[in-house]
Amino acid sequence: MLAVDTGLVEEWLSEFKTLPEASISSYATNLKDKTALISSLYKVIQEPQSELLEPVCHQLFEFYRSGEEQLLRFTLQFLPELMWCYLAVSASRDLQSSGCIEALLLGVYNLEIVDKEGHSKVLSFTIPSLSKPSVYHEPSSIGSMALTEGALSQHGLSRVVYSGPHPQREMLTAQNRFEVLTFLLLCYNAALSYMPAISLQSLCQICSRICVCGYPRQQVRKYKGVNSRIPVSSEFMVQMLTGIYYAFYNGEWDLARKAMDDVLYRAQLELYPEPLLVANAIKASLPQGAMKSSKEGTKCIQVEITPTSSRISRNAVTSMSIRGHRWKRHGNADLGIEEELIEVSETDEGFYSRAASSTSQSALSNSSNTSSKNLLGKSQRRSGGSKAAGREKEGETCREHLSRKQTQRALSENLELVSLKRLTLTTSQSLPKPGSHSLARTTTTVFSKSFEQVSGVTVANNRGGVSGTEANRFSACSLQEEKLIYGTERTDLPVLSKQPNQQRPPSISITLSTD
């Protein structure tokens, strides 16, 4: 150490002792700008055999317990270098030369674990939840949240991590060493924004030294002085990474990158999951090129600007959302089969609708026309006489056989159509729509397929000149539209006129129970 540095340190020691109480505040404000003094103090700390080390440690402790914020931060900036000196001396087992440093570290620790009234501090950390807006993500949504009873009831549901109360320590041992050092590094990280560049450089350098000493990488880094391994804890390495991450974006890119690689190297050797997770996360978030931030500018960690729109989907998949999606799907299906629902009618006092589909209508028309022609021809031939009675009987038998086959074929086709419609109509498709006559009023849904009159005779008293083939197309829906509802003034559908040798028109009913 040079004589100039020794003179600056001695002047600093004597100045504070003669300083009046009223001048402490102005003295503390100007102290952080004395870069030459700060460099000289670093040189004193780095020489454990220096005679000035003990008075310097005592002076720094007086600064810390003075209660002045500027003096407290002045002492904190030397914490990384003090920790390295203590760990290096502990590794060499020369505990006598580290007594003053150990006393300073213990004094700062015992002052930090209690408040001004002497009670133990309990530090709390709220873990942000991604499902709720916080200052860490989507802070723009916080202002729009209404202060309701529901919001207040969920206020205390966030996960909170507590640190403390911490016991007081009278000496540092192998068991409590890193518990104390981790807490001190936590206090240092809390004041990172007030630390000068020389303190950030010291932090990165001592992190690299602690992690590689005694390992093959020490030869690559060309560190000398300490060749034995320095044990570290997982929590201590996480606190080191916190300071390194801040140094990345505040003018110390190269040193911070080297320190992070060394911490990651040591975490891989120790198989510590916490520092591995944090180091890999920092490494993945770093930009490709070096950050050229000004050392004199504002010190902050660059983060991505919070988006104006929420990144989290508010449409969470729940049982209610699944039910709603199912209802929407069934509602669309109901709209798509409106034509098929016309075929469905309500059972009302034994009434069955005479609706028929267009396909079955055409098939039945063909069969009825054929059968009517055969029957008319048969009656004409009977009145003709007995000249060709034998031939008429044979022709009659053939024609009756053909017409019977055609009628049976038409009936089988219509049965297949009705069966297909019954299978395709599901329970969800028969749900009632609001504002309409509900099918749920009855316990049975009847599908009625009435076939046209086989003889083809027109129906008497047709409404508005409707032909006999169209008279049976009225369904329950069409009757309700025409206000032909059964009630006190009940009107029956026109009854087909009966003729001799005419069978009752076949009617097929299929019942779908709601059970």
UniProtKB/Swiss-Prot annotation:
One GO term (biological process): myelination
Biased composition (Polar residues): 498-515
Annotated region described as Disordered, given as residue ranges: 358-410, 491-515
Coiled-coil region list: none
Localization in the cell: Cytoplasm, Cytosol; Cell membrane
Keyword annotations: Cell membrane, Cytoplasm, Membrane
Protein family membership: Belongs to the Hyccin family.
Oligomeric form and interacting partners: Component of a phosphatidylinositol 4-kinase (PI4K) complex.
Protein name: Hyccin
